[in-house]
Amino acid sequence: MKNIINRIAAIALSLIMLLSLCPFAQATDNATDVTILFTHDLHSHFLPSNEDDGGQFGGYARLMTVIQEEKAKYPDAILVDGGDFSMGSLFQTAYPSSALELRLMGAMGYDATTFGNHEYDYLQAGLKSMLNAAVESGDPLPQLVISNYWPPEKGQDGYDADMWAALENYGVKDYTIIERGGIYYVIFGIFGFDAQDCAPNSGMILEDPVATAQATVDAATKECKDNYGTEPVIICLSHSGTSGGEGEDYELANAVNGIDVIISGHTHTTLAEPITVNNTLIVSAAEYGKNLGVVNLSFNHLKRTCTLDSYELIPIDEKVEDDAEIAAMVEGFKANVENEYLSKYGVSFDEVLVNNKYKFDTVKEVYATLHESTLCNIFSDAYKKAVEDAGIKVDAALTAAGVIRESLPVGDVTVSDVFNAASLGVGTEGELIAVYVTGSDLKNALEVDASVQPLMSSAQLFFSGIEYSVNTNRMIFNKVDYARLRNNDGTLSEIENDKLYCVVTGMYAGQMLGSVEETSMGLIGITPRDKDGTPLTADQLVNHVVKDKHGNPVKEWYAIASYLKDMDGEIDEKYAEVDGRKVVYSSLNPVKLLRNANKFTYIVLAVIVVLVAIVVLVVRAIVRKAKKKKANKN
């Protein structure tokens, strides 16, 4: 009996010891759950946006509701953003003065975000002002991280002490380390090459993304291990992007060791499943707050492994209720915009300008093919009319696909709708400029539209005051086979090569057109000039901003809004369908292939003639040699 009791005691003692070791075994062998909530490319879309099918998506109040629901399920979740949090709605007009975007993100509990190219649209002066305004507000703010895109340092050209002071005042860092639920996270920001190309006036210096990212990962990991004795989860907020499963962020993940997750912004990509490369997950949730991305991982800090448990993109749509607190903040910010900005134009945020019963191109359709677009006809016609109303005789106006951010909805079209559609600008909200070009360069602009669009869809141009036709089978830079000025009275005029013509466009498109000669390596050029024919540099275009009769700059969005408001309540029926100002067709008819041929076609024809002549000469030589050889045998 005593032996039995001893055995039972021994077994009980063993069980007690085993149970006491279980927590240790779990801590050492089992992974810890990690949840990352993310967005990117929010573009100041505080309010819901219109779907192509008539529905709505996004809106920060709805987004906040879903964030709270996910945090209720995952209390230790972190919330991050991949940049381009600004520029895309009327709220951007308060960017320099009030920093509405960062303040709202702070209220929503964002842990960190990074800079995208559009954060530099107001140039360094606007960025400095915005950062200081954010701090002065006293509101909670997300940590800003960027590791490879900083201003020139003291002693370098372009050094700006105030810019550095604003960055330091906000507390912008290469990376940040945060702890949540016993897990440490390293979060750092990366700026991509294409993003840099899209921010040519930022005044910042781009360091190599790969080299900087690897150095940042190594330094931050060491700091975390030295200070906290543990391996961190490493998250890169990258404003570089992917395309077709590849792209800059794919190359970044492939080249840099140690990144667990890349939040990939800039390209407005939706990834239904993560891209996995070099043990790194690349994730994207679409633009404008369409979805909240949710990544659930199992992280073993001892083995330094991160395993994907689940990945979800939660739609932010009409089924989601508004969060009352964020909705109230947005309404307050709307009043801010009306008082500080819209009051100068005598309009209000939700003012209905016109009713629209026509379905216009979506932005994707604008980009998709070379074509005439009723939506873009409205925009270019509005530019021309606004500048003519300012007392300037205009021959033509143009807009580019790349500056059109949204379509106009069916039904009531508001001031906010118009601004959202034409919100892309350089430095401010996009002023119109009036410059002069020769007839030859005006034809070159038509060729840029016809020849470059298949290679770069954002370069498609849409004109007012010109009608032309494009044969897609003709030679590059000679695809336009017919072009005439379309005068206000409906008559047509020849475009004379040496004559100067007044052309109106937005500042952004004007700068891009001025760089055509450089980007085409001299093959084709468009030189903006003043009324006397003197060439203008890109920096001089600001001196040609159009002013209205009261001396105020004419904005792209306001030109469109005024044009619509003058339509007496309904969109003019002439915009129900295209009017033939751009005709695109394909023909191999020799007459149509050679009609109005220019130097590019003649050069190719000359090359073909020379090649044919060489072939003929070679064949003749071979035949003569054969005949001579045969004669010698006889």
Regions found by a protein language model. Name each.
Residues 1-12:
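Bacterial N-terminal signal peptides that target proteins for export
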Residues 19-30:
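Sec-dependent signal peptide cleavage junction
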Residues 11-20:
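Bacterial N-terminal signal peptides
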Residues 17, 110, 150, 164, ...:
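A residue-identity detector for tryptophan
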Residues 28-319, 375-378, 382, 436, ...:
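Acidic, metal/ion-coordinating pockets
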